[in-house]
């Protein structure tokens, strides 16, 4: 880096430039260095980062919403109630949170509700873009939740369905007959959370080996490594057809 150049005052006489914080010929003082982080994100000892960035928050209870829900949510609820006579029995609660609509469905009714949401002309939720699982350990006896993201491409709307089951009876009707896109996603929810989708054409594990014990994304799944030992492995020589030297 070049040394600072002399500048001239208004009269054209060179005036030496002295760096801020320097005296005479001494170099300028540098700001004190910040303390070095140790471990993960500055945590020391345990390596636990759960408190970093405000990721730990008190669990809040999400209550059922009351009308009017706002936006197109009332139109969706009204159309579903009109098209589906068992609406009052099948819908456990309606939640509006963070600008999103979630219908909590009785487990045995989930496929019926999806059928109506897809086929009714006033609803037309043609696409199930996602089926995922959630484990709310300690929050409820029915701690395993299946979550369905539905999209109406006709009306450009999105809603969410949620159905909860217990670990002792983790059964839900499969929605693959209504939304074929749910096939592999239901398999993943079964593999990771142990939710059993009755009527699925081939409900097998999709990520873990078939003989794997347990469901890795349940909150009570034991953490720890699996010891694996490799013997007799041979590494082929590198491909020398290309030279990068």
From Swiss-Prot:
Residues 1-10 have a biased composition (Basic and acidic residues). It is a peripheral membrane protein. Its EC number is 7.1.1.-. It is found in: Cell membrane. The keyword Glycosyltransferase does not apply. Residues 1-54, 217-245 are annotated as: Disordered. Its main location: membrane. One of its GO terms (molecular function) is NADH dehydrogenase (ubiquinone) activity. Residues 39-54 have a biased composition (Gly residues). Residues 11-28 have a biased composition (Low complexity). InterPro entries: NADH_DH_suC, NADH_quin_OxRdtase_su_C/D-like, NADH_UbQ_OxRdtase_30kDa_su. Keywords: Cell membrane, Membrane, NAD, Quinone, Translocase, Transport. One of its GO terms (cellular component) is plasma membrane. It catalyses: a quinone + NADH + 5 H(+)(in) = a quinol + NAD(+) + 4 H(+)(out). NCBIfam families: NuoC_fam (TIGR01961), PRK07785.1 (NF005856). NDH-1 is composed of 14 different subunits. Subunits NuoB, C, D, E, F, and G constitute the peripheral sector of the complex. HAMAP family: NDH1_NuoC (MF_01357). NDH-1 shuttles electrons from NADH, via FMN and iron-sulfur (Fe-S) centers, to quinones in the respiratory chain. The immediate electron acceptor for the enzyme in this species is believed to be a menaquinone. Couples the redox reaction to proton translocation (for every two electrons transferred, four hydrogen ions are translocated across the cytoplasmic membrane), and thus conserves the redox energy in a proton gradient. Belongs to the complex I 30 kDa subunit family. This is NADH-quinone oxidoreductase subunit C. It comes from Salinispora arenicola (strain CNS-205).
């Amino acid at each position: 880096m070049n040394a600072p150049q002399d500048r001239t005052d208004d009269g054209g006489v060179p005036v030496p430039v002295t760096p801020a914080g320097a005296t005479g010929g001494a170099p300028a003082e540098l700001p004190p260095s910040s303390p070095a982080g140790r471990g993960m994100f500055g945590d020391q000892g345990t390596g636990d980062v759960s408190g970093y960035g405000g990721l730990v928050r008190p669990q809040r209870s999400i209550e059922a919403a009351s009308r009017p829900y706002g936006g197109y949510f009332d139109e969706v609820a009204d159309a579903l109630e009109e098209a589906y006579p068992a609406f009052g029995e099948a819908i456990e609660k309606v939640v509006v949170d963070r600008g999103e609509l979630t219908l909590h469905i009785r487990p045995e009714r989930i496929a019926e509700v999806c059928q109506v949401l897809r086929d009714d002309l006033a609803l037309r939720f043609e696409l199930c873009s996602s089926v995922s699982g959630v484990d709310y350990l300690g929050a409820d006896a029915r701690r395993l939740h299946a979550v369905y993201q539905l999209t109406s491409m006709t009306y450009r709307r999105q809603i969410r369905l949620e159905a909860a089951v217990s670990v002792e009876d983790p059964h839900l009707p499969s929605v693959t007959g209504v939304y074929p896109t749910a096939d592999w996603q239901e398999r993943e929810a079964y593999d990771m959370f142990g939710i059993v989708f009755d009527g699925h054409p081939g409900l097998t594990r999709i990520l873990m080996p078939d003989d794997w014990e347990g469901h890795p994304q349940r909150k009570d799944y034991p953490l720890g490594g699996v010891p694996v030992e490799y013997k007799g492995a041979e590494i082929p020589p590198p491909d020398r057809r290309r030279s990068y030297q």
